[in-house]
Design a protein with these regions (language model features):
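Flexible inter-repeat linkers and adjacent short helices
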Residues: 1-29
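Non-membrane alpha-helical segments in proteins
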Residues: 1-5, 33-45, 74-85, 123-130, ...
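A conserved hydrophobic secondary-structure block that centers on an alpha-helix together
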Residues: 43-49, 66
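Short coil/turn and helix-start
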Residues: 6-10, 50, 108, 112, ...
Length: 367
């Protein structure tokens, strides 16, 4: 049902609710973990972040009762993801690393994990690490997830692993092989008749083509339209932000899309891409003839503050670079250097990614 109707379809939610009532009547805690996971996905994809977190906590509580490592891995992973959704990056990573450690212990004992944890746990860890500013770690963990995805017999797990690897590439602005990744996602999702992941693949394809200057706008729009048809609201701010960030000729449609993303964040509490949307809005409004510079400065400051509060060092650096560039263009070179230098100095890896290169180039110009 999830593949054909979508994770967020009303029929899916109703089916899991019936299954949960039955498990509770029977006192079947083991099955409650699996049913709870279905409910968690239902709320996640609908961007019902509060409910998602509540169900994730229940899953972990059920898992502790079963004393099953597999269930505990699932519980820690779902709780980690729900924490990430609300912008609590470090707390999210702690839970995901517990899941990763349990998975490693399970493998050392020679026990096979019957779920998709070998793909999903490193996929999420890579995603979180990228936001936290650990680009090299993120790339290594991402590649591990892809290897696991390519070796699994579960095609649904495989397409998830490929999709999240593409997402991590977008966060790190590593677009070189994004088109090939998108094509692989589309092919596998089509084979599985899986509209949810086909939408991801189409959107990634459009983003890759836009970045390369080869059109792509329609492909991205078609992917987003298909995504909405599956009742999915999760990660819409991310998709809007990725689309806007590669546009070469922003328009009024650009600011409308950014605002829709910010409105969605306020409605859902899904805050992990909030800082980037404010930064992108700042980039757009800075060229407006009346009050553009002041509005841009405020948006860049807001983006930096949000990113700092979440521990999203990569987005904080990105916002600081935009703000420092604005200040330097208006005679505040000393302020710009003092803002950007300490933040750039925090980084110990990832010096080949676009964000660090841009920050380093600006600091050199400000020296």
């Amino acid at each position: 049902m999830t593949a054909s109707k979508g994770y967020a379809a009303p029929e899916t939610g109703q089916a899991y609710a019936r299954a949960r009532r039955l498990c509770e009547d029977l006192g079947d805690v083991t099955t409650l973990v699996r049913v709870g996971y279905g409910q968690y996905l239902y709320h996640l994809i609908r961007a019902e972040i509060g409910e998602c977190h509540r169900v994730a906590e229940e899953i972990l509580a059920f898992a502790e009762k079963t004393r099953s490592d597999e269930a505990r891995i699932l519980g820690c992973r779902t709780l980690g993801v729900s924490l990430f959704e609300s912008g609590q990056l470090e707390a999210a990573r702690v839970q995901l690393e517990v899941a990763s450690g349990l998975l490693k212990e399970q493998r050392q004992r020679g026990a096979a994990n019957r779920g998709d944890a070998g793909v999903t746990v490193p996929a999420w860890l890579a995603f979180v690490a990228a936001f936290q500013g650990y680009a090299d770690q993120a790339a290594r963990i991402r590649d591990l997830s892809v290897r696991e995805a390519n070796s699994t017999t579960s095609l649904h797990s495989r397409v998830f692993g490929l999709a999240f690897a593409a997402g991590t590439c977008c966060v790190l602005r590593q677009y070189d092989d994004l088109l090939a990744r998108a094509d692989a996602i589309c092919a596998l999702a089509t084979e599985l008749n899986f509209p949810f992941m086909l939408a991801w693949g189409m959107a990634f394809r459009g983003i890759a083509e836009l970045h390369a200057g080869a059109g792509g706008g329609q492909a991205a729009w078609d992917g987003l339209a298909l995504y909405r048809q599956t009742n999915s609201k999760w990660a819409l701010p991310f998709w809007f932000g990725c689309y806007v960030s590669v546009q070469r000729h922003p328009s009024d449609e650009t600011i409308s899309m950014i605002q829709e993303g910010l409105d969605a964040i306020e409605a859902t509490g899904e805050r992990w891409f909030e800082a980037e949307l404010y930064r992108l809005r700042g980039n757009f409004v800075r060229s407006l003839p009346r009050g553009g510079v002041k509005r841009a400065e405020q948006d860049f400051k807001t983006a930096k503050r949000i990113a700092a509060s979440q521990g999203a060092k990569l987005l904080e650096l990105r916002a600081a670079t935009s703000l420092a560039r604005l200040w330097s263009e208006h005679g505040r070179r000393k302020d710009a250097r003092e803002l950007l230098a300490p933040l750039y100095g925090w980084f110990r890896e990832g010096f080949d990614i676009t964000d660090l290169k841009e920050a380093r180039t600006l600091l050199t110009a400000l020296a």
